[in-house]
């Protein structure tokens, strides 16, 4: 550690720390505009000047590293004059529009002007005015206010990786613009409004809506993806104004999906009253009438239950209590993206924190579009790549990352066994073995050279394996994950403290779901097939919309019209056309509850907002159904319900009373031993379905802000490599029959792969493993 003196007080900091950061860490206030802890140092504003004993002139503290014994002073008469001079320069062209600026009342420029600025300006020349440009749906501009700190430019280059913003001209003509109109393409673009210190870049959806002192701030957890980011919900009354990252949270950024989904809270798609279908219409009724009708449809029937994993821990546990009490033989499913429901050798969830993934020697991404699936984690990997650390990627498509992975390999999904077997061959030659490896690779005849890339990465001292949706949704996923488990154990990456086995889950609470539902779960595809074959009499949907999400929209549409359906949730979605009863459940912003993210971090959230209608927390809806079905209500308050959580998932026992951060480990199943199955008859093309940040999930589709952004990222119906299929209309043959699709061409798709880019259009083939096509070459 390095010892220095700040305002005569001795402090210690890590060597290499800047003076400004040392002052921030120890409570010594130094004004600054251009510095940001997550961005490179620019030293543009010169507001952070400090005096260092023995130095002839003040130093910019943001770019000056500490030294042993250094004596720093942050306040003096000379520094005050310097800061007054810099404020005068910065304010020369800045408009006096604080009363109408969204930043007014929460603006560093205002605060520092009061503290360091003059009461009257001396500049008498013509002030500069800058033309504003439309940057996209999320950011509003007033660039006349810009002080050229370049935070936005550095963010676009270093964090987003898009380079959308740039500096033009110099001197008094200097200006910051987007490269073209409507140019922002990053999944983190909303962060530009957060990092701008002066109100030049503003949040467009909340522009001119409220003043900072009118807003109430509530800490909560975003449930829009497995990352489960810490967020602050800003509201006026019970209306959400904006969502921002929690400053004390793990990640400094949140994605645009988590930031702008809030307009769905008051969407017309919200279920706010109980309803019963009468003819073609769903009509509002009382809770008693709706519950009574649900009991008529469900009691004594063979029931299927399909739910979303994004509910709170308490809500999900209540679903299991309802099943145990009233529907003991029910078929239960919750994963719309998984075909193989056998136990995995390592269950869903991350064994590492995102910081550990950023720091390890090697990272290998297997079959995942992280930019769409987990944009905040992708930012970590982008940061890692930019610092010179390797990231390798194997999959059916070289997904856009706004950076360049160190190594890329394109493969077809049918080649995954050959890739893993090739990696096993190489690590075996290096003398690294695990019991069962010879038997596994002996079951695979083919070899694929992409396995060499995987094996090379595994030979590092530390390695993080990020297993994505291409493997999770594979028909033989259990054997593939067992093969990867063997590789990681052979190479020493499965030990406690260095476990690099990370399986990206579909949603939140993966650790809970494997404990609470692991013994009764089935695949969504099997559930719909059972319904279509007459093996079920009724269906309960809890926050799930299989017509718009997952791999089985065609199967869901065929099955749902054949049986009565009770829909419980916050968003109606496309599946509501089949609902006979709707019961409103409160949104995640309207409940007190617990959530577990993919790292196993337990987040306990209060109730930020009140319900907008007669919605109730999901667990209360479940308990009401238990009572109406004639069962004994197992819990009447959260404390009683949490005792059932602890019984079903012992790893959560006591987390609500514990102090500090709680992390739940990911399950490891030594008995999940599965060898690769023999390939069945396959079609010409392998099918891979796209996950869209702006379209996946009923919440996203109910948000006008996100659907508008999604249109800007629209692709063809399906995509193939030009060597596979020429662009244009083609007839695709599958088990569902023949259908014509508009095929687009991309060279970043593996030959022999048909990439379903628009599931709403091409849902008829999204559940297929392989298909045939007229014409084309493979």
Predicted regions and their residues:
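N-terminal export/assembly segments and adjacent metallocofactor-ligating motifs
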Residues: 1-16, 21-24, 36, 51-55, ...
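A cross-kingdom feature strongest in bacterial/archaeal respiratory oxidoreductases
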Residues: 30, 35, 320, 359-365, ...
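Glycine-rich phosphate/diphosphate-binding loops that line cofactor/substrate pockets in enzymes
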Residues: 290-303, 353-360, 450-464, 527-537
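A generic structural motif
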Residues: 329-341, 391-398, 490-512, 566-575
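Short alpha-helices
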Residues: 396-397, 403-436, 477, 590, ...
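Phosphate/pyrophosphate-binding active-site segments
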Residues: 406-410, 417-471
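A glycine-rich, hydrophobic/aromatic-adjacent loop/helix-cap motif
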Residues: 463-532
């Amino acid at each position: 550690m390095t010892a220095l003196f700040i305002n005569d007080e001795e402090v210690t900091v890590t060597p290499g720390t800047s003076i400004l950061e040392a002052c921030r860490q120890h409570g010594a206030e130094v004004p600054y505009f251009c510095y940001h802890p997550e961005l490179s140092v620019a030293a543009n504003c010169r507001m952070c000047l400090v005096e260092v004993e023995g130095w002839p002139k003040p130093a910019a503290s943001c770019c000056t590293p500490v030294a042993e014994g250094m004596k720093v002073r942050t306040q003096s008469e000379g520094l005050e004059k310097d800061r007054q001079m810099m404020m005068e320069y910065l304010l020369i062209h800045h408009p006096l529009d604080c009363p109408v600026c969204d930043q007014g009342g929460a603006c560093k420029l205002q605060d520092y002007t009061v503290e360091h600025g003059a009461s009257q300006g001396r500049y008498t020349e013509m002030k500069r005015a800058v033309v504003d440009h439309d940057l996209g749906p999320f950011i509003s501009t007033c660039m006349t206010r810009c002080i050229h700190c370049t935070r936005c430019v550095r963010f676009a280059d270093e964090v987003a990786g898009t380079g959308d913003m740039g500096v033009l001209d110099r001197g008094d003509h200097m200006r910051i613009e987007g490269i073209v109109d409507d140019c922002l393409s990053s999944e983190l673009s909303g962060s530009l409004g957060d990092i701008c210190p002066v109100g030049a870049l503003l949040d467009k959806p909340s522009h001119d809506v409220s003043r900072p002192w009118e807003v109430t701030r509530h800490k909560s957890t975003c449930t829009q993806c497995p990352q489960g980011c810490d967020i602050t919900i800003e509201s006026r009354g019970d209306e959400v104004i904006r969502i921002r990252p929690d400053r004390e949270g793990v990640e400094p950024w949140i994605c645009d999906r988590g930031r702008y989904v809030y307009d769905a809270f008051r969407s017309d798609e919200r279920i706010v009253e109980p309803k019963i279908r009468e003819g073609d219409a769903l009509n509002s009724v009382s809770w008693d009438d709706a519950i009574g009708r649900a009991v008529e449809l469900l009691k004594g029937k063979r029931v299927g239950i399909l739910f979303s994993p994004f509910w709170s821990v308490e809500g999900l546990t209540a679903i299991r209590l309802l099943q145990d009490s009233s529907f003991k033989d029910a078929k239960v499913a919750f994963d719309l993206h998984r075909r193989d429901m056998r136990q995995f050798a390592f269950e869903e969830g991350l064994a590492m924190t995102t910081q550990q993934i950023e720091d390890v020697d090697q990272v290998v991404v297997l079959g995942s579009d992280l930019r769409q699936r987990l944009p905040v984690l992708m930012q970590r990997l982008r940061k890692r790549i930019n610092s010179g650390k390797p990231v390798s990627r194997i999959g059916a498509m070289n997904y856009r990352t706004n950076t360049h992975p160190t190594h890329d390999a394109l493969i077809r999904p049918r080649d995954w066994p050959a890739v893993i077997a090739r990696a096993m061959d190489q690590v075996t030659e290096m003398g690294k073995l695990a019991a069962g490896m010879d038997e596994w690779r002996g079951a695979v005849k083919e070899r694929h050279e992409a396995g060499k890339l995987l094996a090379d990465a595994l030979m590092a001292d530390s390695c993080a394996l990020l297993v994505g949706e291409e493997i999770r949704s594979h028909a033989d996923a259990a054997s593939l994950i067992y093969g990867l488990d063997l590789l990681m154990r052979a190479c020493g990456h499965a030990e406690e403290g260095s476990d690099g086995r990370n399986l990206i889950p579909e949603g939140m609470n993966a650790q809970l779901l494997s404990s609470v539902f692991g013994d009764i779960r089935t695949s969504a595809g099997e559930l719909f097939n059972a319904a279509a074959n007459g093996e079920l009499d009724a269906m309960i949907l809890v926050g799930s919309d299989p017509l718009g999400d997952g791999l089985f929209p065609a199967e869901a549409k065929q099955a749902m019209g054949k049986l009565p359906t009770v829909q419980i949730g916050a968003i109606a979605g496309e599946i509501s056309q089949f609902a006979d009863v709707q019961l409103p459940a409160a949104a995640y912003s309207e409940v007190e509850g617990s959530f577990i993210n993919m790292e196993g971090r337990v987040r306990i959230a209060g109730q930020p907002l009140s319900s907008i209608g007669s919605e109730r927390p999901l667990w209360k809806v479940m308990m009401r159904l238990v009572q109406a079905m004639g069962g004994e209500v197992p819990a009447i308050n959260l404390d009683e319900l949490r005792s059932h959580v602890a019984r079903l998932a012992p790893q959560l026992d006591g987390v609500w009373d514990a102090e500090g951060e709680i992390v739940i480990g990911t399950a490891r199943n030594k008995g999940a031993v599965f060898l690769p199955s023999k390939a069945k008859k396959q079609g010409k093309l392998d099918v891979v379905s796209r996950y869209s940040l702006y379209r996946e999930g009923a919440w996203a589709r109910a948000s006008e802000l996100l659907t508008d952004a999604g249109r800007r990222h629209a692709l063809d119906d399906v995509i193939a490599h030009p060597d596979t299929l020429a662009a244009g209309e083609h007839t695709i043959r599958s088990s569902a029959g023949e259908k014509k699709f508009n095929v687009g061409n991309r060279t970043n798709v593996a030959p022999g792969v048909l990439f379903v880019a628009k599931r709403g259009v091409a849902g008829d083939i999204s559940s297929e493993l392989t298909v045939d096509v007229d014409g084309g070459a493979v």
